[in-house]
Amino acid sequence: MPHNHGIAGSSSTFGKDHDLWHDTTFSLSEIIAYSYSPATVPVYAEDGYISTVIALARHADSFGTSNGNHITQTAAYARTLGKKLGCSAEDIVTLSLAGLLHDVGKAFIPEAILTKPGGLSATEWMIMQQHPVLGVRILRPVVKLSPALPIILSHHEHYDGSGYPNKLSGEEIPFGARIISVVDAFTTMTNGRVYQKEMTREEASLELVRCSGKQFDGFVTEAFLEILKEEKN
């Protein structure tokens, strides 16, 4: 095993509570994300709830992407990379769920922001940065998803500490989140967004190399690049 801790890391990853929508007018998202009442979903209802939130994640994925396959590809690559890095079977299931649900919080971001072709304003960018927190709040009632929550919360943290929402760095970032970060970036670049033309696999690979050790964990990046080379061959 290349690491001595689980893919989700410490529960302290969640940090303090967040005032998500301070000084904004998007109260509907606040109501949906904050007022969800059940502390937990009954065990018998968990699978149905998970199916619903996966459908919600697919809906969010359809905005601003060229083909809506981003989360499916992210989950598949996360499984493959997890296996290569020696993760347990249980952790690979968690990575797959995190890959499918990492952007579910975007379902509560205004469509005008998700589909905006130009750069976001400072306020819009602040709102966009809350999607990992919103996602965790929606998923938290499902006990079965608990191992995936720190990964989903931290998948936009950067290895150098410049990411969001908690400015974690290095091994403070859950190992699973470092995996999702790399594969999420690759599938985003190769699928394209409304604000970014899709890249070739070669172009996206070069971008991963450029950002290795800064945005991404270098060890995880190297392992993923090996997977891409194996696919090419």
Where are these regions (language model features)?
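Histidine- and acidic-residue-rich, metal-dependent catalytic cores
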Residues: 20-36, 43-233
